[in-house]
């Protein structure tokens, strides 16, 4: 279903395509653990454009391509003419002559959309300021591992900044029939257009999307609580001001207890700033879940690459 397609936003995927990614990711994870070769991208090359640095993204994509039998090329803005003013459309057309796929991690989402418009090979959004689809799909896989494959009717609560993770988690939950609630401070709400799109997606699967300023209200009945850093990359100058505003949104035991579910999971996409968005003792209690989540980025991204770039 996904062969030759871009993956820019979960909103653009069908429910079947989301399920296809998750199922293949689980299969590839099991094969990797069992030492069974799965060189689905033998002879293929992925270009990795990094305008925004990352530990997990680079390592997981690079290792993933190696395990699939292909190769990954790291391209920082210093390595590309993009950094010297070459139009994105020219870079896209040139790289399409050399590569079988392009992954990009950048700031403005419009840069990814323009790259995809002009590229003749699949483009994968590895993060923009608006969306983080690979991580949100990873979170779905992790929840499936702990809660079972049928996610319909479960509730995901997000507490913190209305950022790219909020947006992509909202889309992901809606696509698989999970109810979603986000709690953010006033002035830090998620993008209104994304919320409207997610509500439309949720209506199609019988789910709900709720936005509130009350973190205790958001987590009631939650099967999983997700949080993220209060100041994303590029917002370092706002750290102190944001910390003051977000302090009531820390994921601590008092908040987790409000879920009313002793089996409620806590997840974090990392890096985590313990004592800020998540209490140290809560992080350590759910460390196995959080690091399973980190590992699953590898398997989900392998599935995305295999489905979009493979034969």
What is each residue range found by the language model?
Residues 200-280:
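Rossmann-like adenosine-cofactor binding region
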Residues 51-63, 146-227:
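Glycine-rich phosphate/diphosphate-binding loop of Rossmann-like nucleotide-binding domains
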Residues 263-311:
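Adenosine-phosphate binding glycine-rich loop
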Residues 1-59, 63:
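Positively charged, low-complexity intrinsically disordered leader regions
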Residues 113-128, 237-258, 285-287:
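A short, gly/pro- and small-residue-rich
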Residues 78-79, 127-131, 185-188, 294-297:
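Short, acidic/turn-prone active-site loops that include or flank metal/cofactor-
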Residues 35, 39-144, 274:
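Phosphate/diphosphate ligand-binding glycine-rich loop within oxidoreductases
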């Amino acid at each position: 279903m996904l062969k030759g397609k871009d993956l820019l936003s979960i909103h653009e995927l069908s429910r079947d395509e989301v399920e296809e990614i998750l199922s293949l990711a689980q299969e590839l994870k099991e094969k990797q653990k069992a030492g069974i070769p799965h060189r689905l991208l033998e002879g293929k090359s992925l270009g990795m454009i990094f305008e925004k640095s990352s530990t997990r993204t680079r390592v997981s994509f690079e290792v993933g391509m190696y395990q699939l039998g292909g190769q990954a090329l790291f391209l920082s803005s210093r390595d590309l003419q993009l950094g010297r003013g070459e139009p994105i459309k020219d870079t896209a057309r040139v790289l399409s002559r050399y590569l079988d796929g392009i992954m990009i991690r950048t700031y403005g989402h419009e840069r990814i959309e323009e790259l995809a418009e002009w590229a003749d090979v699949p483009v994968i959004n590895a993060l923009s300021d608006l969306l983080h689809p690979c991580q949100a799909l990873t979170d779905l896989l992790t929840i499936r591992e702990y809660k079972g494959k049928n996610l319909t009717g479960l509730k995901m609560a997000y507490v913190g900044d209305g950022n790219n993770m909020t947006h992509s988690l909202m889309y992901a939950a809606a696509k698989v029939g999970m109810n979603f609630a986000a709690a953010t401070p006033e002035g830090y709400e998620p993008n209104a257009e994304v919320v409207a799109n997610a509500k439309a997606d949720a209506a199609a699967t019988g789910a709900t999307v709720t936005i509130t300023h009350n973190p205790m209200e958001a987590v009631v009945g939650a099967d999983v609580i997700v949080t993220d850093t209060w100041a994303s990359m590029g917002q370092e100058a706002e750290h102190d001001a944001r910390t003051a505003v977000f302090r009531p949104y820390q994921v601590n035991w008092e908040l987790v207890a409000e879920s009313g579910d002793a089996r409620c999971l806590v997840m974090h996409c990392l890096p985590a700033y313990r004592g800020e968005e998540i209490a140290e003792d809560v992080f350590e209690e759910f460390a196995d879940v959080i690091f399973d989540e980190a590992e699953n980025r590898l398997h989900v991204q392998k599935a995305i690459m295999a489905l979009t770039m493979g034969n």
